[in-house]
Amino acid sequence: SSAEGIMRKLVDEAGLEDAFEIDSAGILSYHQGELPDSRMRAHAARRGYNLVHRSRPVRTDDFFNFDLIIGMDDRNIDDLKDRAPSPNEYPKIRRMTDYCTQFTHADHVPDPYYGGADGFEHVLDLLEDASAGLLATCLAQDS
């Protein structure tokens, strides 16, 4: 949901909120209904993001309702493919870091929850970069 909050802000700032449907979901349902980690919310708030989305699990309908399904790492990608209703949906499944234009060496968004403040800042840096690249890619494909 950090990625959702960042992407939503970028889309809103571009005046494109009516052109995009942005949502986030988790692979596991044990955080269902919870807000993002309070440390992530605090770090994000300092950058102007309001992370208020409550967690929900990925649903089969997501593969029909969204043009892209984005995972944060290879394990997410594998889990998403396992949940896809058919291999026909695989092309919708992408890795978030594939959209990075500054952190081009990054191959995943790490889990910051067991480290210190630097981990949260690094994840936000990656997500800002990838979200900007994702928005640019979507706009280029739409033109």
Question: Which positions does each model-derived feature cover?
Answer:
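Conserved active-site segments centered on acidic
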Residues: 1-66, 136-143
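Phosphate-binding/catalytic loops
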Residues: 68, 74-143
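Acidic pyrophosphate-coordinating catalytic loop
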Residues: 29-34, 62, 72, 85, ...
